[in-house]
Every structure is written in C-alpha cells, then in structure tokens.
C-alpha cells in the first residue's frame, strides 16, 4: 500500500512524545554523540512517495554545506494511523540519523520536544485529476459522479469539510482509496468523475503508466487549496545543524536549485514556504 510519508510523519509528531517518554526500552538508545564534521547522515521512509525527490534535495543541502551526504534507507510500511512510526523515528534520530527527510511542516502541528523542524524546502499541492477534456475545475464535475480521494490525506479532509458545509444534494460522494493506481484506473474507466490526490503521486503515475497521461488536472474550486509544505527533522539537541540546514534551504530556494529539482521530477507548487 502506498502512503504519503508527510501524512504518516505528521501523525507521529502529533503524539508529542520525547525520546525518554516513548515506550522504547532505554537500553536501545545510544546516548553518545556522533562526531563527524564532514558528513550528514540522512534517513528516509523507504515507502515515501517522494523518496527520490527528498534525496535529491538532501544532496543539494549537503553540497551547499560542503558535507558528504550518507544515506540510510530507514523504515516504512506503517499503518495509516502511524502506529509504531514515532518509536522507529525516535530511535533513528537518536542513534543514527542527523536528518530525516519528507516531513509535513505546519505551524499548527504540535512537535515532540525531541525534534526540530527545518524550513520547508518545497510546497506541493493536492490536485484534482479528471479524464474529461471539457471540465476546467472541480465545480464542473456533476454532483451525481463520485470522487476518489487518497485515503486519510489532507486532500480528503478538505473535501469532507467542504461537503459538511453544503446541502446534501450539493455534495460530492466520496470514495477513499488506499491505492492510487486503482483510483486512477477508476477515473479512466468512468467509475469515478475525478480524484483528489497529492500531485507527486499523479506525476509518478503518469511516468509509470502510459494510459495515465490522459488524466489532466483542473482547478480545485470550490475547494480551498490543500498544500503540503515539506521539510526535514533534526534533533532538537543540534540547533547548529538546524540553523545551517535552514540557511542552505534559503540559498537553494533563492538560486533556483530546488525549483529545478521540482521541475526534474515533474512536481508543481513552488520551492520553499
């Protein structure tokens, strides 16, 4: 099952537990401090939909700081509710990782005191994809057609909240999908009028499936914009590293490096905040 790492990580961060307060046996934590001034150890969720993009960003950050980036694949395959993620993340950040990539950055999300969040390095939207050449926005999709949504995603929550504010006969029927491949198939065969999903997922589908290239994005109106701001985690004990990474991100946004990486991967949205 494919998940968006940012959503899983946000679930984990909402737990708000520090290393010492987690359910992990204390003997599993290595409390010695790593001393390696010439390298940056970067970890990833191996099931992340933006895994390769995040690594490209990490390598650009490393180059900007004159540090060798060393990759640790990390972990993945957690359920949608994020169970187990915070423990694995805590162990990794304490024992082996300098930075964990692909985190949804939100000023309103409570963060564990064990972690510090960098500036966003990219802001990437949820999009509406349809297989109809005449529709220009979601408002053109008839209400008697069903919409697919990426299960437990920000885009799905956005539609739920909008529907709740409308009369029943003005709501779209929602079908949540854990598998974006199947959801795309249902849009293509007409079972669904359209689908709401994170844009990098659509970009990946269109790279991997020739038939998915027929899908086109339309404006999300009347829904408000759903934008995921993607950043990284560092240990809250390493304020120097966070400051250096933030400065590197600012420089890479300013000189167009991150925008170029987004273009390379076919991501829409914009670099930085």
Please name every model-derived segment.
Residues 59, 68-142, 219-225:
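Acidic, polar ligand-binding/catalytic clefts
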Residues 93, 101-112, 160-161, 189, ...:
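A ligand-binding cleft/hinge motif common to bilobed small-molecule-binding domains
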Residues 21-103, 264:
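Extracytoplasmic small-molecule ligand-binding "clamshell" domains
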Residues 16-20:
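Sec/Tat signal peptide C-region and signal peptidase I cleavage site
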Residues 1-9:
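Bacterial N-terminal signal peptides that target proteins for export
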Residues 21-24, 55-64, 132-136, 142-154, ...:
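Extended ligand-binding regions for polar small-molecule ligands
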Residues 46-65, 124-179, 200-201:
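Bilobed "Venus flytrap"/periplasmic-binding protein-like clamshell domains
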Residues 39, 120-129, 200, 207-250, ...:
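Periplasmic-binding protein-like
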